[in-house]
Amino acid sequence: MPTIAYLSKELKLSSLSEADAALYTDKSLMRKFCKEHSISSPAFCKCTNMLKAKEFFRLQQGKCILKPLDSNCSKGVFIIEKENDIDQYWEESIRFSKCDNALLIEQYIEGVEFTVDGIVTPVGHKSLAISEKRHYDYNPSIAYELFFSNHNDNYDYEELRKINNYF
């Protein structure tokens, strides 16, 4: 995204700004944005070393997620259940960080994960598709299936659309 934003600016094409591209690419910037705009999100900490990550983990008193700041497709993402897990996964996770020698550790929230895909037009955001994710047992942070549907008997997709179309 940052490359597209930069080229679009140089070529005077309509696209995301470089600031918006950074926001969508850097998970710590997105978490800060959510906090500043009163959007509910998990507690988090940008960490440049394991000691800081362990300190945050102890404060949470429960599961956390360790992830690269700027990776996608769940590469380098691990559920942290005990402090030693940070030692085990730190190096592997940081290998997937493309532009910063830091990781994000955040509070783990139990539940179903959804993906909401959409498009931004001059009149606002329009949610186009919602998927319910199914995860591997061996690494529950990696989805093996995204089940797209227009309706779900167990969850209020209209509410998901409404929330996502708000911004």
Whereabouts are the PLM-identified features?
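Acidic/polar active-site rim loop that often engages polyanionic ligands
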Residues: 11-13, 33-39, 67-72, 141-146
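ATP-dependent carboxylate/phosphate-activation module, predominantly the ATP-grasp catalytic core
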Residues: 84, 107-167
